[in-house]
A protein has these predicted regions:
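Extended, low-complexity cationic-aromatic segments
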Residues: 1-79, 83, 207, 211
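Short beta-strand segments
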Residues: 2-4, 118-123, 145-148, 199-202
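Mobile genetic element proteins and their domesticated derivatives, centered on retroelements
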Residues: 3-5, 44, 50, 69, ...
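C-terminal domain-tail junction helix/linker
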Residues: 14, 182-247
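RNase H-like polynucleotidyl transferase catalytic core
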Residues: 27-34, 139-156, 172-174
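Active-site proximal helix-loop segment of RNase H-like, two-metal nucleases, encompassing DDE(D)
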Residues: 52, 143, 157-179, 190-192
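Acidic, metal-coordinating catalytic cores used for nucleic-acid/nucleotide bond scission
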Residues: 60-61, 89-96, 120-131, 149-154, ...
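Short, basic/hydrophobic alpha-helical segments
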Residues: 64-116
Length: 247
């Protein structure tokens, strides 16, 4: 299974974050900047291995996205073992149809289908739904799985995008889109040298839970306790409360 998403746009603006500074000299960021364009990051993520394929672009039209995605998916398919040929056409179709169970609007499958080789999770955007692109996926044994409305967090490519953005841009002030693209692509190359597989509810979730427990150790908020604190009421307040006509 692979997941795909487009991150951005990233502006040529100062990005807050920590950085190496001499002792006693805090980092400074300008309050004004000039916008000279934006950059986006095309991302194809393999959760099982943690490896990511990226490409920085200044525009993300279908003419840019589809050729890159087809090229990267073809490379991913080439690395897979050969498909099993012992299954009948009916069994191949049943394997495809199994991934559409429960969908409100299932995709119309072509009459002829190759063996199912790869699952692709991507957002429900117009550029991902063009007939030519979807038919190309079917012809190469790729089943598209679209995230529901408001469920883009299910796309695990967004998790690796947050990591790449934080490592590449925080504490920097890029002045051109080329600088943003170079930083993001270099960060992705560094990540692929020692990738981390994605695990739902893994160590990151445990760290967040421990941090939440530290912040809210006494109750639902760090500013409250389990036991209410008694407070003496002034006589004037008691007099006003005793004479109010309603609750």
């Amino acid at each position: 299974m692979w997941t795909e998403d487009e991150a951005g746009p990233f502006q040529t603006a100062p990005y807050p974050g920590g950085g190496w500074q001499p002792a006693g000299r805090p980092a400074h960021r300008p309050h004004e900047y000039i916008r000279v364009g934006t950059a986006k990051l095309l991302t194809l993520f393999h959760p099982a291995s943690g490896r990511v394929r990226v490409k920085g672009v200044t525009s993300c039209t279908n003419a840019v996205l589809h050729p890159w995605l087809q090229r990267e998916l073809a490379a991913a398919l080439a690395a897979l073992p050969a498909p099993a040929s012992a299954l009948s056409p009916a069994e191949h179709r049943a394997a495809w149809a199994a991934w559409q169970e429960g969908l409100t609007t299932p995709i119309t499958l072509p009459a002829e289908l190759p063996p199912l080789r790869l699952l692709l999770v991507l957002d429900n955007l117009a550029g991902h739904l063009t007939p030519a692109f979807v038919l190309w996926l079917f012809a190469h044994g790729i089943m598209p799985l679209y995230t529901p409305l408001g469920g883009s967090w299910l796309n695990m490519a967004e998790s690796i995008q947050r990591v790449l953005k934080r490592r590449a841009l925080e504490g920097t002030h890029p002045t051109t889109p080329a600088e943003i693209i170079a930083g993001l692509e270099a960060t992705a190359r560094g990540w692929n040298q020692a990738p981390t597989p994605f695990v739902w509810g893994g160590r990151r979730a445990a760290r967040r839970e421990r941090a939440r427990q530290r912040r809210h150790a006494l109750g639902g908020s760090g500013a409250q306790t389990h036991r209410p604190l008694r407070r003496r009421t002034a006589r004037a307040t008691q007099w006003r409360c005793s004479r109010q006509p309603t609750h």
